[in-house]
């Protein structure tokens, strides 16, 4: 695998033959400050199944923003919510532009 530039991305995640839209973060989680090597975290949109332990593939579709350190956890949570909305709007635009 290859690690993209750090940041927040709109992604497509494939698992069990299905494709789901998501918002992903690639980075070291600077607000929490607990990592040295970057990791990938994906929040799937409108998804409530348990896929922990499953093999998945992630396709990076669009970069939303660079990784950022927030002043506190509350600010981080607000920005994650904003990122998810930005990703949802990006996917909606792709669908509308295709029609």
Name what the model sees in each region:
Residues 1-99:
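Phosphate/ribose-recognition catalytic cores of enzymes acting on nucleotide-derived substrates
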């Amino acid at each position: 695998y290859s690690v993209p530039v750090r940041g927040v991305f709109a992604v497509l995640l494939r698992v069990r033959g299905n494709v789901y839209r998501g918002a992903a973060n690639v980075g070291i989680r600077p607000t929490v400050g607990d990592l040295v090597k970057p990791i990938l975290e994906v929040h799937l949109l409108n998804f409530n199944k348990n896929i922990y332990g499953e093999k998945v593939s992630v396709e990076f579709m669009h970069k939303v923003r660079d990784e950022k350190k927030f002043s506190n956890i509350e600010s981080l949570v607000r920005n994650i919510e904003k990122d998810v909305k930005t990703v949802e709007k990006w996917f909606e635009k792709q669908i509308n532009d295709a029609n």
